């Protein structure tokens, strides 16, 4: 399956259309996503919210579409149309998937980072764990093994990155991940 953000003029035809993140009927649409599934192309409209939108990204794993936008991550099942939303502490940063990190995927399928946190999701889209206070202006993942996730969080922008190591299965902090002492 393929997934991408859409431009208004792409002219695709969709088998289904979903609206995610709307707190009220008639909410304005901030972004459009197309997810190609076995049953056709699903259009997912992301409702506008009052939040910072620094970065946006999409990933697809099995029947799940992961959408990072604003301060939220949406997990949409393209078959059942079930939607789960996770509110982030600060803006969404980036997705990292097990394949990209060259891990087996046994402990997580997708990682999502925010300005200060890291979320781990399983192959069914369920939240496995969340680790907070890894930075204040961005969290990056550099590598992952069956036992550890190595990354860095920005504590003193611009450029004040501090390393951290988390346990892959639990997200428990092994080392780092806190503001440097002055």
Segments from the language model and where they lie:
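Aromatic (tryptophan-biased) beta-strands that constitute blades/sheets of beta-rich domains
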Residues: 39-48, 83-91, 122, 126-135, ...
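Acidic, small-residue rich beta-repeat scaffolds with periodic aromatic anchors
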Residues: 143-182
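An internal, amphipathic alpha-helical element
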Residues: 112, 129, 139-143
